[in-house]
Amino acid sequence: MGAVAGPEIERLVQLLARLPGLGPRSARRAALHLIKKREALMMPLSSALQVALDKVQVCKTCGNIDTQNPCTVCTDPKRDPAIIVVVADVADLWALERANATQGRYHVLGATLSPLDGVGPQDLTIDALVARAHAAEVHEVILALNATVDGQTTAHYITDLLQDANVKVTRLAHGVPVGGELDYLDEGTLSAAMRQRTLF
């Protein structure tokens, strides 16, 4: 069976299919929707993508992405400079910001240690984190890393490196999510929740 659309449209579909969460069928539907909504959607999207391409950059202080450098989080005077929240990637930073979970500042590692994937300490921004943690104003480093083997390995590695820094190193609690039912949780989550129980 031959191509259904011209090469330009097929190229659009192929590019959309590279996005996370979009397979070939979803990409084709998205492309059709964009084409049908050319004025209302495709043109503003094209403009926004061009602005992002021209202006978005990585913050030299924390690793966030923004249109200014240092980013708006790092330059916000309401942020507590005594707290650094360590995350694996920008998506985690954005999740914490949506939850309004902290008024501290961030440090984006870029990933977690993963020997199986060939990701070592030299591939992450751990050296910059250690340097920031040694600043006189920093009193706490919060490890907001995923509760995976790679996340825990990274947390232990960072904790060891920060032993000589005059900072408290904490990590996010792991356990029962809000609205979670015990019967649906895995054994590891239940064990972590039981170990990290708090007074009520």
UniProtKB/Swiss-Prot annotation:
Domain of life: Bacteria
GO MF term (any one): DNA binding
Zinc finger boundaries on the chain: C4-type: 59-74
Alphabetized InterPro entries for the sequence: DNA_Rcmb_RecR, Rcmb_RecR, Rcmb_RecR_Znf, TOPRIM_dom, TOPRIM_RecR
BP terms from Gene Ontology: double-strand break repair; recombinational repair
Keyword Metal-binding recorded: yes
Sections of the chain in a coiled coil: none
Start and end residues of each Toprim domain: 82-177
Keywords assigned by UniProt, alphabetized: DNA damage, DNA recombination, DNA repair, Metal-binding, Zinc, Zinc-finger
Annotated Pfam families: RecR_C, RecR_HhH, RecR_ZnF, Toprim_4
Gene3D superfamilies assigned: 3.40.1360.10, 6.10.250.240, RecR Domain 1 (1.10.8.420)
Role, per record: May play a role in DNA repair. It seems to be involved in an RecBC-independent recombinational process of DNA repair. It may act with RecF and RecO.
Family: Belongs to the RecR family.
Name the record gives this protein: Recombination protein RecR
Gene: recR
